[in-house]
Swiss-Prot record:
Localization (cell): Mitochondrion inner membrane
Transport as UniProt keyword: yes
Lineage: Eukaryota, Metazoa, Chordata, Craniata, Vertebrata
Protein name per its UniProtKB record: Cytochrome b
GO function term, MF aspect, one: metal ion binding
């Protein structure tokens, strides 16, 4: 068996990635989220596949086909809610995974980090298109508002929007192509995940100290397989509690009303995991400026390696930057809250202040804090 594991051309790759992989001996539970994201992706692909067997991507029947899945298909309600809440669990794991990377300076593994940013954009695009498919009120108006943002691009904007819509408004053609893209993207994401892992295994994992761990490695199996399994059990437990007891708690009641182009909902908002970016978009009165801020809110992660001024990699022994980091986390919670509020006083001004704080902390305050810490600790 050992011989096959180490010599078979295909099993050898799995062995080097998940069994005999040398891993730092001190990585904490914050390193569990990579495997949990892999599990989320598998769950989403499987539940999505079964949903696609019963779903119809036509404006006349899309809404009723989702109702049919919940009412008439065996365990259809379970598959549908596992898929919907699975997306929320996916994003919770994603945000924690990225947060861990920022805290422990994992962005210094530039190829892995940039691949992760591409993955984040791909997952966000997939989730957005998936939200359009049930063809409820929020699906339709969310699609209209977000795709319409592309019209802010000078010269080609309007043509681009109509090209994406496949007509002069969000309609049958839009729904069909969104379903096609929503189906294919997870498989592209799976391929990108393999590239992400390939880059990671070139350098090896980071660890909570931020120090080189080559002198102290342990095999991934059994130590981290059993540790990851605990994370898997917790994730599945939380997912099932959410799916079976509170299936609609993270959704929008408006999406239980069929799409109606003649009736605008009083408050258009995306799913909770996009609210922070939506708040940044809305905080700028100019359309193009808002779109740029929206893209930059995620793309700013790519600047992290350039903005790293400290001689230490992780924030473990850097109290000033740690404080900045947790203020940033609090700021993201504020932005998420504001994104779900109506556009009126005092929410407008709070959103603008939180948006300015978000970019200021990342671009100015954290790099300055790093330099101050270098001086305090005589690391120059």
């Amino acid at each position: 068996m050992t011989n096959i594991r180490k010599k078979h051309p295909l099993i050898k790759i799995i062995n080097h990635s998940f069994i005999d992989l040398p891993a730092p001996s001190n990585i904490s539970s914050w390193w569990n989220f990579g495997s949990l994201l892999g599990l989320c992706l598998i769950i989403q692909i499987l539940t999505g596949l079964f949903l696609a067997m019963h779903y119809t991507s036509d404006t006349a029947t899309a809404f009723s086909s989702v109702a049919h899945i919940c009412r008439d298909v065996n365990y259809g309600w379970l598959i549908r809610y596992m898929h919907a809440n699975g997306a929320s669990m996916f994003f919770i794991c994603l945000f924690l995974h990225v947060g861990r990377g920022v805290y422990y300076g994992s962005y210094n593994m530039i190829e892995t980090w940039n691949m992760g940013i591409i993955l984040l954009f791909a997952v966000m695009a997939t989730a957005f298109m998936g939200y359009v498919l049930p063809w409820g009120q929020m699906s339709f108006w969310g699609a209209t508002v977000i795709t319409n943002l592309l019209s802010a691009i000078p010269y080609i904007g309007t043509t681009l929007v109509e090209w994406i819509w496949g007509g002069f408004s969000v309609d049958k053609a839009t729904l069909t192509r969104f379903f096609a893209f929503h189906f294919i993207l997870p498989f592209i994401i799976t391929a990108l995940v393999l590239v992400h892992l390939l880059f990671l295994h070139e350098t090896g994992s980071n660890n909570p100290t931020g120090l080189n761990s080559d002198a102290d490695k342990i095999p991934f199996h059994p130590y981290y397989t059993i540790k990851d399994f605990l994370g898997v059990l917790i994730l599945l437990m939380v997912s099932m509690i959410l799916t079976l007891f509170f299936p609609d708690v993270l959704g929008d009641p408006d999406n239980y009303t069929p799409a109606n182009p003649l009736n605008t909902p009083p408050h258009i908002k995306p799913e909770w995991y996009f609210l922070f970016a939506y708040a940044i978009l809305r905080s700028i009165p100019n359309k193009l400026g808002g779109v740029l801020a929206l893209i930059l809110s995620i793309l700013i992660l790519a600047l992290m390696p350039l903005l790293h001024t400290s001689k230490q990699r992780a924030l473990t022994f850097r109290p000033i930057t740690q404080t900045m980091y947790w203020i940033l986390v609090a700021d993201l919670f504020i932005l998420t809250w504001i994104g779900g509020q109506p556009v009126e006083y005092p929410f407008i001004i709070i959103g603008q202040a939180a948006s300015i704080a978000y970019f200021t902390i990342i671009v100015i305050l954290m790099p300055i804090a790093g330099m101050i810490e270098n001086n305090i600790m005589d690391l120059d």
